Amino acid sequence: MSLSSGGWTPTPGFTPDQSAALPTHYGASQSQLGCQTVLMSVRVSVCHSGIRPLCLPGAGDESLRLQLSMDPGKSGEFRLSLQDSSGTGRSVTIAEFDLGTVNYEVKSPKCHELSLVAPPHDRISFNFRCEQEAQEWATVVLSSLREAQRVAPQDNGPQRPLDGLNLQNTMILQRTEETCIELTRAIEAGDMQAASAFAATLARQHATLKIQPSAGEYEDTEISLAVVVEDSSSSCCVTVKVFPHMTTAALKQQMFLEYGFHPRVQRWVIGQCLCTDQRSLASYGVHQDGDTAFLYLLSARHARLTLQVLQQDQESALLLSSPSLSLPTPPLPATSANGPSSLDQRPYTTLPPRLHTSSSTERRNISEIKDLINLEMPQLNEALSPNTASTQGWSCPSCTYINKPTRPGCEICSTNRPENYIIPGGYRPDQLELRRIQQEKEAIRQYQQAREEERRENFARLVMMDSQDLLPNPEPVDCRICYMDLQPGEGVLLRECLHCFCRECLRSVIMLSEEPEVSCPYRDDTYSCACSLQEREIRALVPAEEYERWLQRGLSVAESRCEGSYHCATPDCLGWCVYEDTVNVFHCPVCRKHNCLICKSIHEGMNCKQYQDDLAARAINDSAARRTTQLLKTLVQSGEAMHCPQCGIIVQKRDGCDWLRCTVCHTEICWVTRGPRWGPKGPGDTSGGCRCNVNNQKCHPKCQNCH
């Protein structure tokens, strides 16, 4: 007898000596390998917990082995046995279990536990020598256990003939499939009436269907999809080869195989849409090389993903993706709304259901399976290992994406190409790159053309605006003088400072100004505009008489401020000139008189000597002239009058502050210091003049606001 799952089963092949060495309540047998194929065998030490002792007299830990075998002629027939090879030279089966009715659990990296499903629920703990051997054993046993559990319901007994109910179900299924085929044909032909009838028939049957476009509707060309992978703390960019007809679920499975990201933690965003598993990539706009998708990774806790589930799914994915197994890849647990599924049951297909009886073929398939299982995550290691192949192109310093040599910026994050990168001399761009270069040249040409057109339009607009004497306000504003609301075009926009006022206010400012330069009237609590109105703006704002008066005021100020100026001696004449060393006579263009610049008078018909003699003679006999001269000298000597420091005429202060201005040269004078108020550069120049209020000091103790 030998221990099996759920009880004791007879096992032939014991010798009388071997049977005598075992307890009466425990049976041992020799392993029968004539019809069994051994998948894997490892050395273990055993710790048994149950109502029956599990031991063999004289057997040590070094002689115990766990052995997994299968029957090539029966699908899902796996046997797990505990062998002893001490002393006798032959392996003796201590215990043997049907793998389909036991539970196997990984307790720690070097400790596994087996328990019986049926009473008395014995438990056996196996301790392995190294972690790698324990991991390889767990991979094979767990995969075989799932295969045995999947096949078990199909092998409960011999198949019975179909009864009436099964026959009826078969007929219903046939009619449903035929209706689906007819519905497909009606939709392809565009027959709306027939399609509606077939759809109604299926709806009455409550048929469970899966409808999706045919693969022929998509382009069957493999493309490169740029994937930006991000989690809560980091991000990177990878390139994945995909087909447009692939679904999001297939893309998740591919990323799981290549990079180890479980489908439960994957969230895909393409074209600002959260992708669902059933839709294809083409439905989100993925059609050509370089299209971008974003993959956001959740935490395992948020996705309710355990380490055991991850390892099981990795083992299944690696086994199913191997070409040697030649089996279709079933999907991993379905996700709803791009999230984790609440179901833990998932289909598995690990080993081939039936192996050929030929010894050479059997040995080849077994070795292929063992080679596949002995590799520790081969696809993941290859996918995550750095690519050692030499690739032409430059690596982005920000996202590490490998770009084509001629690309000026990163295709993913638009970072500029490193300045020290040199395009290889013998590099030849491919067709896609040549098209991109041509598109860039065309884009640059169009940009330059649009920019030149914009410059021409701006220049034409500026020329048109410059031809206008007054610029109207382009938007509603308030006049800062009269506070009237000005609609677009009702006000005047000053060219120098872009301040806007109404026409009447600007006209009043010009007419009341005593200076030849009319300043902008804008004032507020913190700012005073220092710009001036242009001559053409003044000409367009005031009448012709006021404009002439403004021009004459400017000439008068220019004459008074000019050191070498001379005014025509004719009464009420506005003509004047500037002294020159070689010119002694000024021909006035206003009154047409000839002024002697030496005598500073008009003495036509007399030379300078004759005129001076005549003037001296008239001064002796003219008593009025003598009294006037004597009065002016007395005023100057008494301090009631003074000579202008610029032109020398006599000026007099009547009342008020100590500031006054010469009526001839318009020089600002400080009365208390008897000198100019400002320096040679005019108003604001404190390098000369009386320097009043410089360093908070008055120019004179008796100063009465000369500023």
Curated annotation (Swiss-Prot):
Q: Where does Zn(2+) 5 bind?
A: 644, 647, 662, 665
Q: Tell me the GO molecular function terms.
A: ubiquitin binding; ubiquitin-protein transferase activity; zinc ion binding
| One GO term of the biological process aspect | protein linear polyubiquitination
Residues holding Zn(2+) 3: 568, 573, 588, 591
Q: Name one GO cellular component term.
A: LUBAC complex
| Sorted UniProt keywords | Metal-binding, Repeat, Transferase, Ubl conjugation pathway, Zinc, Zinc-finger
Please list the residues that bind Zn(2+) 2: 497, 499, 520, 529
Indicate the enzyme's highest-level EC class: transferase
Query: Which positions fall inside the Ubiquitin-like domain?
Result: 223-286
Query: Does the entry feature the keyword ATP-binding, yes or no?
Result: no
Give the boundaries of each RanBP2-type zinc finger: 390-419
**Gene3D superfamilies from the xrefs?**
Phosphatidylinositol 3-kinase Catalytic Subunit, Chain A, domain 1, Pleckstrin-homology domain (PH domain)/Phosphotyrosine-binding domain (PTB), Zinc/RING finger domain, C3HC4 (zinc finger), Zn-finger domain of Sec23/24
Give the highest taxon in the source lineage: Eukaryota
Reactions performed catalytically = [E2 ubiquitin-conjugating enzyme]-S-ubiquitinyl-L-cysteine + [acceptor protein]-L-lysine = [E2 ubiquitin-conjugating enzyme]-L-cysteine + [acceptor protein]-N(6)-ubiquitinyl-L-lysine
* TRIAD supradomain, as annotated region: 475-703
Q: Which residues of the sequence carry a binding annotation for Zn(2+) 4? A: 596, 599, 603, 608
The residues the record assigns to binding Zn(2+) 1 are 479, 482, 502, 505
Q: Where are the zinc fingers (RING-type)?
A: 479-529, 644-673
SMART domains hit by this protein: ZnF_RBZ
Transmembrane region positions?
Answer: none
Q: How does it assemble?
A: Component of the LUBAC complex (linear ubiquitin chain assembly complex).
**Family membership noted in the UniProt record:** Belongs to the RBR family.
Q: What does this protein do?
A: Component of the LUBAC complex which conjugates linear ('Met-1'-linked) polyubiquitin chains to substrates and plays a key role in NF-kappa-B activation and regulation of inflammation. LUBAC conjugates linear polyubiquitin to ikbkg and RIPK1 and is involved in activation of the canonical NF-kappa-B and the JNK signaling pathways. Linear ubiquitination mediated by the LUBAC complex interferes with TNF-induced cell death and thereby prevents inflammation.
* Record remark: domains: The RanBP2-type zinc finger, also called Npl4 zinc finger (NZF), mediates binding to 'Met-1'-linked polyubiquitins.
Q: Can you name this protein?
A: RanBP-type and C3HC4-type zinc finger-containing protein 1
Identify the gene encoding this protein.
rbck1
